[in-house]
Structures are given as structure tokens and as C-alpha cells.
Amino acid sequence: MAKSSKKKSFSVSQMSQLIDKISDETKIIIEDSTEQGYINTDIYIMNALLSKSILSGGVCDDRITIFAGPPNTGKSYLIYNIARNAQKAGKFILFIDTEHSVSRQVLQGFGLDTNVDNLKLISSNKVEDLKIFLTKFLDGLKTAKDDGAEIPEVVIFLDSIGQLASEKEKQDALDGKNKQDMTRAKSIKQLFRVINSDLGYLGIPMIATNHTYEDTTAFFPIQIMSGGKGAEYSASTIVFLSTAKLKTGREDEMDLNSSGVIVTAQSRKNRIAKPKKVKFEIDHEYGTNKFKGLEYFCTPENFEKVGIAKGKKSEEDGVIGLNPGGTRWYVRHLDKSFFEKQLYTPEVFTQEVLEALEPIIYKYFDYSSFEEQQSFVEKMEKDEIIEDKDFDEIDNDDLF
């Protein structure tokens, strides 16, 4: 009688070890246990739009983020501020200028250290050349990392995607051919497809700007990004910017009827925070006020926690409260009322106030958790059962 063959076991632990072994050999990332980090934008409400948190949020420090919009909407202004804060956090800046509009003097004016040991500025707008450069640069860092070296923290800025040209586009111009370039979008898509995985492996963020134009073929005309869909697919966060004139009363006849711009930032794609839109201001003389936009959450409902809201002070049994209404804002910790234009100061929005606002704003921008979604489904199912029961109990005479 033949002996029955006993099957050998292959445990989950062995399978996990096999995956680890193959990953080491092929350099494939199987997990990322590092905590998500962010680079401050210097505008609290923009931090929340990008990452939910006003205090510790901002641009993801290991993903692709794109700010897109028409000219003069603050795209470059935003990335200069982000670059400055990245340097403060000890990161090296690789700045790629495709518009030939950035100089070391411009960057210095925004507070950046342009020493070559802290920042490299590259000017090129040919997408194929940039693909080769970035691929070789990232591959060199990967080799160093795989050899056990601790590589510097790097942030790549690309200003802008919309100004990238293809080899064919340039060659057609040299040949005197006035043809539409059908290869440009494909080349840009290749660029992002080639570098995206390496950026993730190295934990390097790319923060880019892009142009937008109106798609008139859509049923309702909408703004879309230049350069095709490649960058859109690769980016984790895409924010569209638009502007209106900012009038402060300081304008003179040479100010083009405005003192700056009111920027509307709309999150078109975000894997971390709910897609929302916020507003902030860029004053040509004073820059941005980082507190602007926080007043939206200073409501009578939040007054007990935050201590700022539009209304008048009330007091009963020694407890300070609020009578909502009016045009002035009552600030509890200062025991004073302010007009809105006086509101946006560190004396009003103290660290204690910001910490009180943090969980309120975080929840507003946060996606629902799995438990919250399940609770909602269960409630809906329960409500359906009650409605069905109520309907069954209706007499036919009640229907007519």
C-alpha cells in the first residue's frame, strides 16, 4: 500500500520573508512606514486645503503637487514660499525654470538661500532633456541609497509644465514647418511616468506649476491643464487658482485699480483632504496674511472653543458668552470687539486660538473614516426599515 504524501506547509511568515527578499533584490517598495510629512505654505487655510491641518500641514513632502492657473494667479509666489520653508527644514532645493523667468536675485528676494550647496537653479524647457536629466539624477540617488548612504533631503520645483516643449516642436520650427505638435503631451506623460516611482522610492516631492486654458468643447466650458493628462494622473494633489482684484483703499492712479489679488484656490484632486475651495489674499505691498480665511470657522457655534465670533459680548453668572449678529467681531481673550480688517493679527489669532481651531478645521477637511461610513449605512438601513413598516401600516382608505 502506497504511503500518502504529506503536503509541506508554507506559512504566511515564510511568504512575507520571500516578498522581502525579492524586494531587496529588485528594489521594489513594498511598504512605507514613515510618517507623512508636510512643507508649510505660510498660509494657514492653504495648509488645511492641502492636508487638513493648519498647524502641521502643507504640501506633501514625498508626492507630486501641482498649482495650476492663468497668469498672475500666484502660482510662482506660492512655490517660492514653499521653497523657503523647505530650506528652513534643511532640504536641498532643485529648481527647474522652463520659462526663463527665475534668477538667483528673484529667489533671494523671497528669502531663499541661493548658495550652490543649498540650491541649484536649472533653466531648460525641452521635455526630453529634462527626462534624461531627472532620470539620471534620481538613479544616482537610488544607487547611493541602495549602497547604504544617507541621501540629502531634496525638493524638486518645476516652473512650469505648461512651458515645456518637445524635440519635434523645436525641430519643426527649425525646418520652417508650422504643424501642430502631437508628441508634446505624450513626452510630458513619459517624463512623469518615468520619474514618479523613483520620486516615491527616494521620498522626494515635486512641486510644479502649470498653465490652464478653457476647454470650449465641453458642454459647460471648464478650465483644464496644459500638457495633456500625464501630469494629472501622476500628481497626488492638484490645486487650480483664480483671482479677483484686491482693493484696500490705498490705490493710486498708477495701481491699475487694485492693491493685489484675491486668490481662490480650488482643490481639483487630493488624496489626503476633501476637495474644497478657499480664499486668501496677496497684497503687492505686504504679501499674504497667513490668518486670512480662518474667520470662516470663527462662528457662534464654535465660540465656546475658539473665543472669536461675529457678535456682541454677553455675560451671565460670570460666564462670558456671545449674542450673534452685527458687523464687529468679539475676541474673548482680549475682551475687545474688532472690525474684520483688524482681525488678522497674531494678537487675535494666538497660538491658543490656532490650537482650538485645529481640530475644527481638520474635521471639516477630513474624509469620513470607515467606521463613520458604516455607521451612516446602518442608519440608512434602519431608516428604510422604519419607513417600510410605516408604509405597510397605512390603510388603503388613507391613500385615496
PLM feature spans:
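Conserved phosphate-chemistry cores used by DNA topoisomerases
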Residues: 7-12, 22, 26-32, 41, ...
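Terminal-proximal interaction/regulatory segments of ATP-powered molecular machines
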Residues: 320-400
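Phosphate-binding/switch region of NTP-binding enzymes
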Residues: 181-297, 301
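The Walker A/P-loop phosphate-binding site
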Residues: 3-116, 134-135
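Conserved catalytic network of the ASCE P-loop NTPase/AAA+ motor domain
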Residues: 56-60, 85-89, 111-115, 140-150, ...
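Conserved inter-motif catalytic segment of the P-loop NTP-binding fold
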Residues: 89-180, 190
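Long, well-ordered amphipathic alpha-helical subdomains in the mid-to-C-terminal portions
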Residues: 290-340
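Hydrophobic/aromatic beta-strand patches that form the interior of the parallel beta-sheet core
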Residues: 65-67, 94-96, 120-122, 207, ...
